[in-house]
Amino acid sequence: MSLFNTVRNTIVPVHKEGYPFVAAFFVASLILGWIFKPLFWIGMIFTLWCAYFFRDPERVTPQDDDLVISPADGKVSAIQMVTPPAELDLGSEPMLRISVFMNVFNCHVNRAPMRGRIVSINYRSGSFVNAELDKASEDNERNGLVIETKHGQIGVVQIAGLVARRILCWANTNEPMDAGERFGLIRFGSRLDVFLPAGAAPRVSLGQTAIAGETVIAEFASAKGPVISRRS
């Protein structure tokens, strides 16, 4: 393996949504360094942090339609039966909700938890309380996707947080989606909620660290046999 390939495989790519921010921090570092040289190195620290925040590593996603994969990097902050948000139009019956909280040090690229077709995408404005609080699911700005899967419709909700003020979603209604496929990003700390129908059982614990596109957070009763994975 060449040195170039070694370096390329070692460096984690930056998502394109982060390019303007990284460039802005770098230019600011040059300007500050021209004014006072030590400020250049301080600026470069922030530039590197920004690149780290917008990192977009490859993930190896289990390919099994009975498994539910974490849509985000972070900490499992809630596992409970709740009524899904009205805008998702998933009915009034309680569904299993698994929440993953992302702090500013987590990778913030969001991935599909299951394979299926996007039925609807619903944005709702709101406040910006701490995303780790339970009331954030109802009060905060959010963007919800409904995905038709083998086991029925599931909901995936991107929730803005205390610092996060920008939800990005590049998925479209009626598009097919693979498990682990990238569909969005939330800037600077936030939360993802997954709403699952009857038959789903959690496979994570409160406080457990989840990895987007890799960690199995739930499964349906028919899950069996060896699991095949693919890079995403």
Swiss-Prot record:
The modification Pyruvic acid (Ser) is found at residue 190. The record marks 189-190 as: Cleavage (non-hydrolytic). One of its GO terms (molecular function) is phosphatidylserine decarboxylase activity. GO terms for biological process: phosphatidylethanolamine biosynthetic process. InterPro entries: PS_Dcarbxylase, PSD-A. The active site is at residue 190. Keywords: Cell membrane, Decarboxylase, Lipid biosynthesis, Lipid metabolism, Lyase, Membrane, Phospholipid biosynthesis, Phospholipid metabolism, Pyruvate, Zymogen. One of its GO terms (cellular component) is plasma membrane. Its EC number is 4.1.1.65. Belongs to the phosphatidylserine decarboxylase family. PSD-A subfamily. Catalyzes the formation of phosphatidylethanolamine (PtdEtn) from phosphatidylserine (PtdSer). This is Phosphatidylserine decarboxylase proenzyme. It comes from Rhizobium etli (strain CIAT 652). The lineage of its organism: Bacteria, Pseudomonadati, Pseudomonadota, Alphaproteobacteria, Hyphomicrobiales.
